[in-house]
Every structure is written in structure tokens, then in C-alpha cells.
A protein has these predicted regions:
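Small, basic N-terminal interaction modules of short regulatory proteins
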Residues: 1-65
Length: 65
């Protein structure tokens, strides 16, 4: 999993797993999902990310070794 934040556009991109994207679905005006050929979510994009969450703090829980 990769998290990327783009300060210039206030966009948070969360890649759940590397995959070829075959479809993009808009959940709302600020959130999009990227789907692979099987329809599984492989990435999520959040526009206006800093207004939706406190990006100064990231907590990871239950991370498997």
C-alpha cells in the first residue's frame, strides 16, 4: 500500500495494490475509485484532503508482519 499527498492540489492518493486500472468511478465530487479488470478497488483519490482529515497525523494499526 502506498499513500501519496500532493500539496499543490491538496490531493491524497491511496494505492491499495499495484494493478492496471480499467475503470474509474466517481463516488462524489471529491472522491474517486480506481478499479481493476475484476472490479476490485486498487486505489482511492481524495480531493480537498486537508479539509476532510488531519493530514499531519497518520496512525497505523494492526499491521501484519
Amino acid at each position: 500500500m502506498k499513500l501519496k499527498y500532493f500539496d499543490d492540489t491538496d490531493t491524497l492518493y491511496i494505492e491499495l495494490r499495484p494493478a492496471a486500472v480499467s475503470e474509474t468511478r466517481e463516488l462524489d465530487e471529491s472522491t474517486t475509485l480506481e478499479l481493476d479488470q475484476e472490479g476490485s478497488v486498487c486505489a482511492i483519490t481524495f480531493e480537498h484532503a486537508s479539509t476532510r482529515s488531519d493530514l499531519r497525523k497518520l496512525t497505523v494499526e494492526g499491521l501484519a508482519a
